[in-house]
């Protein structure tokens, strides 16, 4: 059955809110709606799961091999190593590069903690850099200032669905002989356009790309999952070994590894959803366009920008609130049963886990400015126009009441 009508990407209206005496039926608004996304592809997913159950090949079965192959073809990259989750993907990537305790790894502070958590876990030294106030991705000038003789790797994060400035990052990495690991957990399917017109998928430009298939992601499993990818066969083979107890052959362990596998059921589900990823991303882009148009006349809202070098797949629709009490804004929406989230309320350099490094005078002005004012609105593939109208009117009513 066709999920969306032929005139647009929004699904048909569902079941309520009252507006000018009219009742509009509406589903409960959620930040993420994995249930209805599943229901839209239920037959395909159920059959894929049943196929795995019928073969009983639960670990590294055909579904895993098929998904790895299909993901590689989609991304345009040679080697894909599936693993248990996105955090493992980052950890395995760093382990494969033979980084040593005390080596410095540069990451943005304004991101989810997993990016930096694995750096500390491996006894490497995290070096926090600032982000661009428009894209929320790694700031190039801040990156340049952070490089020292101890720097060994850069981990740019394609935050919220927008690509980091990879061309400049790769140039800097080449100049200083540094590794680049792309954290692509929030931007799978996004395109990056180089100055010469070359287009590549995010996650495929550095030495290694890492992603997460957490259920809320643009390409989400029905549990945990992740993957690492590279065009370097030596690195790919080593990452595959590390992900499987460091084994080169069964019971022969060449390197210290871990146990990090994507199971066949999750791979089978992801294989179904991978074929729909571009459609899912277009649905998110349509939601974002609706929001941006609705908020165009509100000076206190800074809507997400899209750079000329990057598409945006809107894992999150994150706004900045200028001169506004964010807690009052959130409470106003909550009273209307409109959820919103703060990604992220505490940046990496201020987390308690890095308390010993907080004596360092980090020059992260943009990060410090963004943290108190960002707010993310609901965005997912199953939103309909009734919900979007209700959300945007709810946001607008907050600013109308202030006037």
Question: Language-model segments: what does each one mean?
Answer:
Residues 18, 25-57, 62, 378:
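N-terminal "arm"/small-domain region of PLP-dependent enzymes with the aminotransferase-like
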Residues 95-191:
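PLP-dependent aminotransferase-like
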């Amino acid at each position: 059955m066709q999920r969306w009508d032929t005139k647009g990407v929004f699904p048909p209206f569902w079941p309520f809110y009252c507006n000018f005496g009219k009742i509009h039926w509406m589903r409960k608004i959620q930040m993420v709606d994995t249930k209805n996304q599943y229901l839209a592809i239920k037959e395909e997913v159920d059959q894929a799961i049943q196929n795995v159950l019928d073969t009983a090949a639960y670990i590294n079965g055909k579904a895993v091999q098929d998904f790895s192959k299909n993901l590689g073809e989609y991304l345009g990259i040679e080697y894909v190593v599936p693993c248990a989750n996105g955090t493992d993907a980052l950890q395995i990537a760093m382990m494969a590069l033979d980084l040593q305790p005390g080596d410095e790894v540069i990451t943005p502070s304004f991101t989810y903690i997993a990016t930096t958590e694995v750096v500390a876990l491996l006894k490497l030294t995290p070096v926090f850099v600032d982000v661009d106030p428009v894209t929320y991705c790694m700031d190039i000038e801040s990156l340049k200032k952070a490089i020292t003789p101890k720097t060994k790797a850069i981990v740019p994060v394609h935050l919220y669905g927008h690509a980091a400035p990879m061309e400049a990052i790769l140039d800097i990495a080449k100049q200083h002989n540094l590794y680049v690991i792309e954290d692509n957990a929030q931007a799978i399917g996004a395109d990056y356009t180089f100055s010469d017109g070359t287009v590549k998928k995010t996650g495929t430009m550095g030495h290694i790309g890492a992603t997460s298939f957490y259920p809320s992601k643009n390409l989400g499993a029905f549990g945990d999952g992740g993957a690492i990818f590279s065009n370097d066969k030596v690195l790919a083979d080593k990452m595959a070994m590390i992900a499987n107890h460091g084994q080169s052959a069964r019971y022969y362990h060449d390197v210290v590894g871990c146990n990090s596998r994507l199971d066949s059921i999750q791979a089978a589900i992801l294989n179904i959803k991978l074929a729909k990823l571009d459609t899912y991303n277009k649905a998110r882009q349509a939601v974002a366009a609706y929001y941006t148009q609705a908020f165009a006349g509100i000076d206190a809202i800074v809507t997400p920008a899209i750079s000329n070098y990057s598409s945006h797949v809107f894992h999150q629709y994150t706004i900045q609130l200028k001169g506004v009490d964010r807690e009052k804004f959130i409470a106003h929406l909550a009273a209307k049963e409109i959820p919103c989230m703060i990604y992220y309320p505490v940046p990496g350099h201020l987390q308690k886990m890095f308390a010993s490094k907080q004596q360092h005078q980090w020059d992260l002005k943009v990060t410090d400015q963004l943290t108190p004012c960002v707010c993310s609105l609901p965005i997912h593939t199953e939103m309909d126009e009734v919900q979007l109208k209700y959300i945007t009117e709810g946001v607008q009513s907050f600013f109308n009441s202030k006037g």
